[in-house]
């Protein structure tokens, strides 16, 4: 990189846009101009990559979420210019640390969106023609504040200072039609820079805009709200991720969102293909579309509709093309997450598409009759039935391939939730265990550990081939290396402690065990179990039954969906437990409970590097995969978890002896749950009863609800004893696993006393994390589902002098 030229361009941009200099610019101004300078640097490579992708068979990844995280640091890393840019800024009294408070792009919520981001990163790094399609949310999910222990949601206006990593592509805007309105979908393109290559992928995000911004006739008549109604109604479609669907209006808006980006993406794909080839007959030869969960499944009938209604194909030919093009990733076995839409609602919102959904269903029925299936079988599997459109079933019927995201998850799908479909189309089912990008989740977020690994291996090849970490196993008994690793971990714990103090105003002791659970708040992820276990340990310390407890800081980070009452009650419960144990003189030096606010990618980057213990405690058989477990493993935490999701493969790779597995397994739960009565545990185990009683005896405040009403903690209690919603009592086996979980927690606590032996366990987890790179996952998709190959034409040395595997220093 020519530093003088880079600085000149940066200075010019600051002067032109803001009338300021590098020395005087506000952080957001510096970020804006630095981004613009980098965008100029990659411009020719990005354009060449677009052309190369269009010349190749390419994959299009449709996802409701893309949780990209902060772009600036990752892009500098991938370009290999982090140190040079930081040195340049420091020469003028600034540094890259000045950009620490730049907002994350609020384009997702949890693992689904982060997985999509990792996939784009891996594809770009390995020259694979993969591009993403999603929604450019104005406010994302929400910004979380904890007020008096309660989650409060605020609008997350992440673009208030601009969005310098996006380009608005006005010429590519398309029209999306609903039953009651027509809107524009305007694309904003974000570059996905490949590490150590010239390849730059594209994430195309659609923003909803009104066809008519302002109705002057309405304004002239004094109807001022009516004058901007069309504009507001259109913009609402892309304002918020996952609008609350507890009401009819919320359901309509969510369906409109799903159709909005699915329709716009299909239109864009067809338009580009036609421009290149002049025909859609060969669409399946050049395009493959991956549906990330059920949200974009409406793209299936939409593609068929466009082929028939706008390009004159007959239905059967359009169906054949759709079958060649689409593939579907299933992310859950939970019935409530396998989307179903009321037929009445679908017909109302997208009447033209609904017609083709019915045609798909009719074809399915004919196919099944041809296979001599009976009515009961057909009714059970039909994409439309019981007044509902079953999105997962429609995806499975039309797609070429269906995949689960961890070995145990795929096995459960085949034997349980999708057993009939697997028996019908066994050749379509595959497993693709999820992965994470080591570039963001090690090279970027943990430069000290990265430097140690690179020193020991003699090179940084691991940044693009994580299997190289296996060579670290030989150092597992090297006391000097383990001491270096422990020093790195200590530095990261100090860094996190400083950030938590600044961000949340809470003091935490870096000399304690950092036991961390960070993930979306949901009952199946069992933050509730973790909270109850802390109470169990607290009372055990108080009564002397638990002795010699190693001081531990229990850290939670999670957001609850705004309308999810019990999840929000769990957040409040964690806060109340925190108040209790943190203030008690008997325990305050042994236990600290912290709930960090507004957990996001940037916060996660600090948490995963500092963790000693990774909490992965979902009920066996409910977590499809999980990726937080992989990030924490890669940074040297042991897994305390159930035999669920990717935990299974983590212990297979790193050894169960180097992790802590507890609780009932899938096959055991299949036998236990039909006759399970949690009250038997409650009334036979005094220690568990003591903990549960605190939810209803007034010891913990759930917000001062009058005694004649049912408070939120009592609702949590009754969910365990009597059941809640459509669930049986203790549906997620919290009480059933509690004793086993506490004992596993205490085993971790005792083992930590031998620091060197514990460090060895952590080190062996790092050394065996190679399988969990998203590079491996994406290559598997490319070879076995998408049938795409690297665009090797554009991997020659770059004119922008990118230095291969140039890692930032750990200073």
Residue ranges and their predicted role:
Residues 1-793:
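A conserved ligand/cofactor-binding region detector
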